[in-house]
Amino acid sequence: MDQLTDRPAEDARTRIQAKNRETILAAGREVFARHGLRGATLDEIASTAGMSKPNMLYYFRRKTDLYRAVLEEVLTDWLLPLDALDPEGDPIEELRRYISAKIKLSYEHPQASRLFAGEMLAGAPHIETYLSGELKEIVDRKARTISRWVSEGRLAPIDPYHLIFAIWAMTQHYADFDVQIRALLGKQTGKPGFQEQAAQAVLTILLKGVTPR
């Protein structure tokens, strides 16, 4: 009887812990994107998360542990649309969905892109194993899918890795260089439809380049 009584309480604690962890990761993403690993402090992250520092340390004992968890969460979010490429689907439509999803991520989570860019510029010391492991595995698998589409004549001849790199570069530009874009385009960036206009430009450039002629 005690076990049945304890289970709802344990489930509630699990939900609270999951929610707290999610809150800490979101706060870490914001603060790390603003200050980098060196400039960020656990005090500021805890304040942003709306909890005490000791409470936060229950979930992440070191700043580097939290930083690594934030980066891995970012990469997981980014890899989901790539991993969703269906080898049996229409190549152009599959790429259209992927590119659109990447642009949406850049607009909705620009801090994540800037945080990742900072880690790359530093030589990726905290996620090098992740990059050469899980990331490489997914990219290699999807590169084989793109190569198959090319060999079947369903895509124009293109190196699959460089296509993936080009998609990353063009979509993440809108997050990494947001300040430059706003400086050059001014009020245009705040007008309704600007995001859709940017997405369509990227889609047109990339998809016309891989459409069989």
Where does each model-flagged region fall?
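Amphipathic alpha-helical linker/stalk segments
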Residues: R68-R97, V139-S147
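Hydrophobic/aromatic residues within well-ordered alpha-helical segments
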Residues: N20, K63, V70, V74, ...
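Short acidic/histidine-centered micro-motifs embedded in hydrophobic/aromatic stretches
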Residues: L115-E119, G133, A166, M170
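C-terminal peripheral helix-coil segments that are non-catalytic and often amphipathic
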Residues: M1-P8, K104, E108, K136, ...
